[in-house]
Amino acid sequence: MSGSKGFRTPDASDKPERGEVNLSLRTVQRMLPLVQRIVDDILACQKAVVQLQPQEASLDRQKRELAWPERARRYQIKEEMAQADISLQDALSELRDLGVVLLDSEQGRVGFPTLVNNRRAYFSWHPGEDGLHSWQFADEDVTRPIPLAWLKEISYSGKA
């Protein structure tokens, strides 16, 4: 890999074929800080909606009897929920634009598409992990640790 600027293998190219994105481990490691922030935004939006839904439901049931302050609060909650939904859709769109897949919306687990032995796979990460440690085949739920050999190839090819 002398002279190579990035980690490349035949199984993991940054160039999409047939519209599919295949990310190298090196690229995924560089993308991770941005994706972490996007996932944090997604989880915050979901939490906001979950917290506002009971208030909205309660005020909606009483909407004909509400005094102005409660009615104003009902409108405010609806606006906050709409804004949270817009922010959520924006964050999901950012992930899609990066080629990243949301594998578990409750946990915030994401998959970075790649190929392993010519099979569709994901490098996976979720909030709470201090870095990228696992991967899985796209058609399986079983996560596997990233082999040390893959990590060594990155360190041999330059700064990780």
Question: What function would you assign to each model-found segment?
Answer:
Residues 1-62:
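Long, hydrophobic N-terminal alpha-helical segment
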Residues 89-160:
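Glycine-rich, aromatic-bearing surface loops/beta-hairpins
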Residues 38-41, 45-48, 52-55, 59, ...:
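Amphipathic coiled-coil alpha-helices
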Residues 8, 18, 26, 30, ...:
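Arginine residue identity/basic-tract feature
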Residues 54-80, 101-122:
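Charge-rich, acidic-biased intrinsically disordered regions
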Residues 3-4, 10-13, 18, 23-24, ...:
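Mixed-charge, polar/low-complexity N-terminal
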